């Protein structure tokens, strides 16, 4: 198991798609026609602070001003980690700290892409919102966008956006569960083996460790038998009461698969 590698060709294609999606969204926003936008709200401040604590252990920092962060800060972070051993891990945790994007009929901007206008236009063969947008564009280009047609789209698009967002979340969850199942099957053959990983999350009940092969598992607090550990919420770490031993975000540890 290894992280997916985005090569130069992939990045070029992604850039073309982003530009096309942004251009179409901006054009139809200013035409003031009914439309389906792809929006992404600002991240939760607490999650961003947690991300900042995590990356500090790798020597990186992000500037958080007045309880909010500018998307350029995260873009700079991703540029700094490009090609480094910790790129995949920090990239995934950065993504987890974001809110989930959704489909809406009002353009409120896209935080992750740092743009005011965005939509999904480039893949009508596999995403319904893209197909809906192509129908709107077709009506508009052929001169059929009269008042009756506008009222039609005004009546159906809110439900289209809501349903598409719900179905996307279901599909994402199914994909995550499938990935988890395959990772469990893979690690089942490696029970008893020792791996080195990085602490990717800390909670009252223990901490999570992510291995270089992207598999993540829980080290429950009851398995830490050398001391009684308590959770320090302010610094996201487990601290031993007698030994003062620390387990914190970003720390490298060795684990036994059980």
Task: Name every feature range the model reports, one short phrase each.
Residues 1-211, 218-220, 225, 229-233:
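Append "with occasional cross-activation on large, charged helical scaffolds in nucleic-acid assemblies
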Residues 188-194, 228-255:
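Short nucleic-acid-contacting surface segments enriched for D/E, G, S/T with interspersed K/R
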Residues 202, 255-257:
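A generic structural signal for residues embedded in beta-strands
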